[in-house]
């Protein structure tokens, strides 16, 4: 059965893709979002759901989870004209009569126009690289923190020395029974002020040590074996939960198959966010142009222009004058 052709398909369900979908709904067109992850929200939802964000207009501060929740709630107004496809990776798209054929790892989709809002691409956590690590993952070994309360009263070990590792350690200090940070260097890569707070806290710091083995029963890790760098000293740390904060690697590996002009991992666009292929637009971190500032707020501003240009492309004979939302929603 042939999939119906949507007006606009948005590749990427992060903050910019979600707002673009909302604005497209506001303009009265049908929208499909294709997201490679198992949930919407992109990096704010997955990587820093409980960290504060300070550069979203009209919000003095809010967490990544709150930002995602607000965007999904905003989009729900147009759920009757919005379709969401999760855990689908866009492999290729081709120009066909009436629009584009979009092939993913699961299906073939059809769209009259495309807006690419996939950020820097798919991302995956950098792991410890230890045997049996995968067995414990998502049970009591975590690569990102969704809820701080889940660690209440626990012995928590954090591996890493960057901003995320230090921030989580400080955030968990008053929640967990104990917090231990293991880092391979004596110096931390985090912001100086955060490091000062860490050193003045009750968090246990073990440097320079590297993880060597995990011990546990079933799917639960019980001990992390660490070794001092360039020495034979070995320690076994008892734990209830282990947080691995080595960062994430990103990849736009399929970009080369999309037949678009790009630089590094971003797509070259015009001032109207048109890519090198007519009918395909790019916004957010996926888009590259002179003077680009990679902020969520920037992407929010790019979304309406891209949506309006997509509508002009699809319906060139329609009266496409932009109307303020106060005139469209009661």
UniProtKB/Swiss-Prot annotation:
Its cofactor is FAD. The keyword Isomerase does not apply. Its EC number is 1.18.1.2. FAD binds at residues 35, 43, 48, 90, 123, 285, 326. It catalyses: 2 reduced [2Fe-2S]-[ferredoxin] + NADP(+) + H(+) = 2 oxidized [2Fe-2S]-[ferredoxin] + NADPH. Gene3D superfamilies: FAD/NAD(P)-binding domain. Keywords: FAD, Flavoprotein, NADP, Oxidoreductase. Signal peptide: none annotated. Binds 1 FAD per subunit. GO terms for molecular function: ferredoxin-NADP+ reductase activity; flavin adenine dinucleotide binding; NADP binding. It comes from the Bacteria. PANTHER family: THIOREDOXIN REDUCTASE 1-RELATED-RELATED (PTHR48105). Belongs to the ferredoxin--NADP reductase type 2 family. Homodimer. This is Ferredoxin--NADP reductase.
């Amino acid at each position: 059965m042939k999939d119906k052709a949507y007006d606009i398909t948005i590749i990427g369900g992060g903050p910019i893709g979600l707002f673009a979908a909302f604005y497209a709904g506001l303009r009265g067109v049908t929208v499909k979002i294709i997201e490679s992850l198992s949930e919407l929200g992109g990096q704010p939802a997955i990587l820093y759901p409980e960290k504060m964000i300070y550069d979203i207009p009209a919000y003095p501060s809010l967490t990544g989870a709150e930002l995602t929740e607000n965007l999904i709630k905003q989009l729900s107004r147009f759920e009757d004209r919005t379709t969401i496809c999760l855990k689908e990776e866009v492999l290729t798209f081709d120009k066909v009569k009436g629009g584009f054929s979009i092939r993913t790892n699961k299906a073939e989709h059809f769209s009259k126009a495309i807006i690419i809002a996939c950020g820097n691409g798919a991302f995956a956590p950098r792991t410890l690289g230890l045997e049996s690590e995968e067995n414990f993952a998502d049970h009591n070994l975590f690569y990102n923190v969704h809820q701080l309360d889940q660690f209440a009263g626990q012995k928590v070990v954090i591996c890493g020395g960057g901003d995320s590792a230090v921030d989580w350690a400080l955030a968990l200090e008053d929640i967990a029974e104990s917090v231990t940070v293991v880092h391979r260097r004596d110096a931390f890569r985090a912001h100086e002020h955060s490091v000062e707070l860490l050193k003045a806290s009750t968090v246990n710091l073990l440097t320079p040590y590297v993880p060597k083995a995990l011990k546990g029963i079933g799917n639960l890790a019980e001990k992390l074996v660490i070794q001092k760098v360039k020495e034979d000293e070995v320690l076994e740390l008892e734990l209830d939960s282990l947080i691995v904060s080595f960062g994430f690697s990103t990849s736009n590996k399929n970009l080369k198959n999309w037949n678009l002009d790009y630089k590094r991992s971003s797509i070259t666009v015009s001032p109207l966010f048109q890519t090198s292929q007519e009918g395909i637009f790019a916004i957010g971190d996926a888009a590259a142009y002179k003077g680009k500032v990679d902020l969520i707020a920037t992407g929010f501003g790019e979304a309406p222009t891209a949506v309006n240009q997509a509508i002009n492309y699809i319906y060139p004979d329609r009266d496409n004058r932009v109307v303020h939302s106060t005139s469209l929603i009661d």
